[in-house]
Amino acid sequence: MGKLTILVLVAAVLLSTQVMVQGDADQPADRDAVPRDDNPGGTSGKLMNVLIRSGCPWHPWCG
């Protein structure tokens, strides 16, 4: 009976260390992450940035 108890304790320790090393694979920060908007103005904002940088020939568009 003593050997069985030791065997169960060793198995429990090995399983707990495996869980600690591997993690639980459920990362709520990664799963619920919202993609960063690199272009907050959208396509029109990107177009305006290009036009302003290139010396926009259409003054009503360039503001």
From Swiss-Prot:
The modification 4-hydroxyproline is found at P57. The modification Cysteine amide is found at C62. Disulfide bonds join C56-C62. Pfam families: Conotoxin. It comes from the Eukaryota. Expressed by the venom duct. Residues 28-39 have a biased composition (Basic and acidic residues). Residues 24-54 form a propeptide. Its main location: secreted. Residues 24-46 are annotated as: Disordered. Keywords: Amidation, D-amino acid, Disulfide bond, Hydroxylation, Ion channel impairing toxin, Neurotoxin, Secreted, Signal, Toxin. Residues 1-23 form the signal peptide. It is found in: Secreted. One of its GO terms (molecular function) is toxin activity. One of its GO terms (cellular component) is extracellular region. The modification D-tryptophan is found at W58. PROSITE patterns: CONTRYPHAN. Belongs to the O2 superfamily. Contryphan family. Its target is unknown, but this toxin may modulate voltage-activated calcium channels (Cav) or calcium-dependent potassium channels (KCa). Exists in two forms, due to cis-trans isomerization at 56-Cys-hydroxyPro-57. The cis conformation is the major form. The cysteine framework is C-C. This is Contryphan-Eb.
